[in-house]
Every structure is written in structure tokens, then in C-alpha cells.
């Protein structure tokens, strides 16, 4: 697991979305041998709860999450599985 990369992803999401809950996992080991793994980009999953998601559609929530780490996509992040919830949904 790349702890530095995880902390950078976490920091970017926290700065952009002020989550009340954030669980971020490096799932790269589950994708060893996958074509995307060769590029060095990791596979991650995130469960994030933020007030910014209240009243937002799923596609908007995902866009907000992707936007928070946009500069890392396709180089350091190959895949990101997202569960994005509003506090009222927890």
C-alpha cells in the first residue's frame, strides 16, 4: 500500500468536501496483473459522507469526488469506487 498516496487522496477529499466520515482503502493488491496496474495507478475505494451531497444526485456526488482528486486521476489513481452519502442517509 502506498501510504503517502493514500494520505494525499484523503487530504484532497477532506479539503474539497469537508466530510463528516471518510473511509479510503487501497484495493490495488486485488488487481495485481490487471492492465491498469502496470501504469502504476492504484485501485481505491472510498466511502464518504458530506453535507455537500445533501439534495445532490448520484452523478453530481461522484463528480464532486472525482473533481477533488482530478490531478491524480489516470496517473496515480487508475480506478476509484465511490460510495457518496449525505449525513441524512447514514
Regions found by a protein language model. Give the residues of each.
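A generic structural signal for short beta-strands and their flanking turns/coil linkers
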Residues: 18-20, 40-44, 76-80
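N-terminal/domain-start segments enriched in small and hydrophobic, helix-friendly residues
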Residues: 1-3, 50, 68, 76
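Histidine-centered active-site/metal-ligand motif
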Residues: 31-34, 43, 62, 78
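C-terminal structural segments of small proteins and small subunits
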Residues: 58-90
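A short, structured beta-strand/loop element
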Residues: 33-51
